[in-house]
Design a protein with these regions (language model features):
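Electrostatic cytochrome c docking/interface patches
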Residues: 12-31, 45, 67
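Post-cleavage N-terminal segment of exported redox proteins
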Residues: 1-23, 74, 101-105
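Residue-level recognition of conserved structural "scaffold" positions that shape functional pockets
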Residues: 11-16, 33, 55, 85
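The canonical Cys-X-X-Cys-His
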Residues: 26, 31-40, 98
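Extracytoplasmic electron-transfer domains, predominantly the class I c-type cytochrome c fold
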Residues: 36, 45-46, 53-105
Length: 105
């Protein structure tokens, strides 16, 4: 399955025109938007958890398995802690690209 294709398959109307995720573009978005609070190269926390291997873990800090849908929900709504909702700050394509990048960690 192409990275990001799971998001497309969720029936989320907003993502109907979104292309499969591009991990290289997702890294650029991560570096500009997420890296201030999240480590990509370790599981050590900054303000938020380190995200290395997040899609390989049995569960994230919220006790949910990292899936395209669960990560997209956190990106859009925030985590209820320090993570702000980014639904209006990132385009749908940027979100899919970040998810593709996170899968490479």
């Amino acid at each position: 399955m192409a990275a990001g294709a799971g998001v497309l398959g969720l029936g989320l109307g907003a993502f109907a025109a979104t292309k499969p995720g591009d991990a290289a573009k997702g890294k650029d978005v991560f570096d500009g938007t997420c890296a201030a609070c999240h480590n990509a190269d370790s599981t050590d926390p900054k303000v938020g958890p380190g995200l290395k291997g997040v899609f390989k873990k049995a569960a994230m800090g919220n006790k949910k398995k990292a899936t395209d849908a669960s990560v997209l929900e956190i990106i859009n709504k925030g985590s209820g802690g320090n993570m702000p909702p980014l639904a209006d700050q990132l385009t749908d394509q940027e979100k899919v690209d970040v998810i593709a990048y996170l899968k490479t960690l």
